[in-house]
């Protein structure tokens, strides 16, 4: 007997590029995920599939500050069908980011990411920049810190690149749980995921990954630098091109060894001298 179709709610927000960086984590708690589509160089569409629409819209208005949005109803047999239609394999440089239900065979080097649990599905320019910059750095045998790991995508790529040990941290519960799950399904054995704040960390690392927004970098850049070993490298993104000049004030004697730009965002490879 065919199952009766139920309705799924889709919420669409048109926003400026960069707004998605500041989505509160309550958004991820109330939605099956967020998908980002480019409308133009400066405009994006954020697509959500909330389980309880009224509660989600309250968070969208009161926490995220969006008051204009579209709500659509879609009849589906299975909620999972919506997710599978919305999340397809994505190529970034040499790597493919694919959802767990897609067969890895034929995709070469790939990262399995459960979509929507936390920021970091590979769709955003800052994640793409980080992955492309990471390819330019030697990871084999290195100890790596992924500060603000989100979905864990960068930690998993560090594992693929041959890192000896990776510590992935995030102070948000949903990101921590997402990274734990993604690390497990990728069997990234060298990656340890912890719910921690940057200020709680000690020790030094060969490579520090920091895909963070400018406000966090402004307040914590000295801490990030201290976590890198002498001659270690820091790979940064989450910086708007217009903010690069300000960032240069905080990097001190760090040497810039690589720069990549994409869609109004910039990323840097820095060496601690």
Where do the protein language model's features map onto the residues?
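S-adenosylmethionine
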Residues: 132, 171-273
């Amino acid at each position: 007997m065919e199952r009766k179709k139920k309705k799924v709610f889709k919420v669409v927000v048109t926003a400026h590029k960069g707004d998605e960086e500041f989505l509160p984590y309550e958004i991820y708690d109330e939605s099956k995920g967020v998908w980002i589509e480019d409308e133009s160089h400066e405009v994006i569409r954020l697509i959500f599939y909330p389980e309880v629409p009224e509660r989600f819209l309250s968070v969208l208005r009161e926490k995220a500050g969006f008051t204009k949005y579209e709500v659509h109803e879609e009849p589906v047999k299975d909620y999972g069908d919506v997710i599978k239609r919305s999340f397809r394999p994505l190529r970034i440089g040499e790597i493919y980011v694919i959802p767990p239900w897609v067969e890895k065979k034929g995709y070469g080097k790939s990262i399995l990411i459960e979509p929507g649990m936390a920021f970091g599905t590979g769709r955003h320019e800052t994640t793409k920049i980080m992955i492309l910059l990471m390819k330019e750095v030697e990871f084999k045998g290195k100890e790596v810190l992924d500060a603000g790991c989100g979905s864990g995508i960068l930690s998993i790529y560090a594992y693929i690149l041959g890192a000896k040990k990776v510590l992935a941290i995030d102070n948000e519960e949903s990101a921590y749980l997402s990274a734990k799950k993604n690390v497990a399904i990728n069997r990234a054995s060298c990656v340890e995921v912890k719910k921690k704040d940057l200020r709680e960390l000690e020790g030094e690392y060969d490579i520090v990954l920091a895909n963070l927004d400018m406000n966090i970098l402004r307040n914590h850049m000295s801490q990030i630098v201290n976590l890198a070993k002498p001659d270690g490298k820091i790979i940064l993104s989450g910086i708007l091109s217009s903010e690069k000049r300000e960032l240069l004030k905080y990097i001190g004697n760090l040497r810039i060894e690589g720069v990549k730009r994409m869609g109004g965002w910039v990323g840097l490879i820095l060496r601690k001298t």
